[in-house]
Amino acid sequence: MSIRIVPKDQLGKQREKGTTAGNIPPLLFANLKSLYTRRTERLQQLALDNPLADYLDFAAKITEAQQKALHDHPLVLDMQAELVQSAASGKPPLDGSVFPRTEHWRKLLSALIAELRHDAPDHILAVLDNLDKASVHELELYADALLNRDFSQVGSEKAPFIWAALSLYWAQMASQIPGKARAEYGEHRQFCPVCGSIPVSSVVHIGTHNGLRYLHCNLCESEWHVVRIKCSNCEQTRDLNYWSLDSELAAVKAESCGDCGTYLKILYQEKDPQVEAVADDLASLILDAKMEGEGFARSSINPFLFPGE
């Protein structure tokens, strides 16, 4: 199964071509009113008793700055034309690798830099100064490289700040998509149907979507449904195993696939209602080390941890 977003007026006409898998919503858009505040609070909470406390606090400062930039720099767009075009082509409407960016994302980056300067330590301040002095051409090259997953072209010290601006920009655009999602037969379920990026982790929900697993996009913050007991990367079901650091009742586990040799974190709200896709993934890097020691490669990227040059 794959997911496509179509204009609302086309949904009824095309419903018979796909399947809604019962009443399961195939796609959930982020609630930007609470997303960054909740993430900040969770990062700060996890930092209280974690060997990575300093880095979790650092990430919390970035998400706090994202919340302020969201408030100070709203974005209003008419996405109807992009949605119609993407529905016809079968491509994500905000495909990060080809979508034409405006200067808005650079305004967001400038706002983040200005906010983070206040109490930044010297080594972070040096990175912020470097980005602040970068030309438009340099910044756009950095953005192109990150969005096309060519991480070697961007220093790992710069990437979290650039990505924070890009992600906020994409999340603002995604929140204004005037369409509905439908599930249909197809491929590439491992990629976000909104922007084509990859997940940071997956979350098994409680409440309205109780027991359903959604992959959380590391760019536009949308979530898309992928059934449990299936590899989110290759969709095989034969050789899946679940790993944790504590016990079978752990709220954070890693799902490994023997077919493709990858793993993805799964966060269970049933075990801990406070789990958050980015924060809990970042706070459980010891589990990543365990998985790499077992010979598995991570199939996702956390927006605060990019591969080095």
From Swiss-Prot:
Q: Where in the cell is it found?
A: Cytoplasm
Family to which this protein belongs: Belongs to the FdhE family.
Tell me the organism.
Yersinia pestis
Supply the Pfam families for this chain: FdhE_C, FdhE_central, FdhE_N
Q: What does this protein do?
A: Necessary for formate dehydrogenase activity.
NCBIfam families to which the protein is assigned, alphabetical: FdhE, PRK03564.1
Q: Which SUPFAM superfamilies match?
A: FdhE-like (SSF144020)
What is the name attached to this protein's record?
A: Protein FdhE homolog
Report which superkingdom the organism of origin falls in. Answer: Bacteria
**Entry keyword set:** Cytoplasm
**Coarse class of the protein's main subcellular location:** cytoplasm
Q: What is the lineage of its organism?
A: Bacteria, Pseudomonadati, Pseudomonadota, Gammaproteobacteria, Enterobacterales
GO terms, biological process? protein maturation
Q: Which GO molecular function annotations are given, in alphabetical order?
A: ferric iron binding
A GO cellular component annotated for this chain's UniProt record is: cytosol
